[in-house]
């Protein structure tokens, strides 16, 4: 994997892929899937005082937050820590 280190109060998140099948078993084509706003924290910036999440946390972030980047053909976001609205506990 490319070594991307967010700066300051930014966080790198791997976006959770949208479901490819409905509950009833119908397949959803790639172009019809909705973008999720849930992801996993991959890396955090150096300003740890302002960052309340840690690597490995599953988080909910604002819908239009951050800058999209592709790493190894997977969608990721680099966003400010304040754009994360919740930690999802399993």
Curated annotation (Swiss-Prot):
> PROSITE patterns, alphabetically?
CHAPERONINS_CPN10
Q: Where is it chiefly localized?
A: cytoplasm
Q: Name one GO molecular function term.
A: ATP binding
Asked if the Swiss-Prot or TrEMBL record annotates the protein with the keyword Cytoplasm, the reply is yes
UniProt keyword annotation of Chaperone present: yes
Q: Name one GO cellular component term.
A: cytoplasm
| InterPro entries xref list | Chaperonin_GroES, Chaperonin_GroES_sf, Chaprnonin_Cpn10_CS, GroES-like_sf
Name the GO terms of the biological process aspect: chaperone cofactor-dependent protein refolding
Alphabetically sorted, this entry's keywords are: Chaperone, Cytoplasm
Indicate where this protein resides in the cell.
Cytoplasm
What family, per the record? Belongs to the GroES chaperonin family.
Assembly: Heptamer of 7 subunits arranged in a ring. Interacts with the chaperonin GroEL.
PANTHER family in alphabetical order: 10 KDA HEAT SHOCK PROTEIN, CO-CHAPERONIN GROES
Q: What does this protein do?
A: Together with the chaperonin GroEL, plays an essential role in assisting protein folding. The GroEL-GroES system forms a nano-cage that allows encapsulation of the non-native substrate proteins and provides a physical environment optimized to promote and accelerate protein folding. GroES binds to the apical surface of the GroEL ring, thereby capping the opening of the GroEL channel.
Q: What is this protein called?
A: Co-chaperonin GroES
């Amino acid at each position: 994997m490319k070594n991307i280190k967010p700066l300051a109060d930014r966080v790198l998140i791997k976006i959770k892929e949208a479901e490819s099948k409905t509950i009833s078993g119908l397949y959803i084509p790639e172009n019809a899937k909705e973008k999720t706003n849930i992801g996993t924290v991959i890396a955090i910036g150096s300003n740890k005082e302002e960052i309340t999440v840690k690597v490995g946390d599953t988080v909910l972030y604002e819908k239009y937050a951050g800058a999209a980047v592709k790493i190894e053909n997977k969608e990721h976001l680099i966003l400010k820590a304040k754009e994360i609205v919740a930690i999802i506990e399993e």
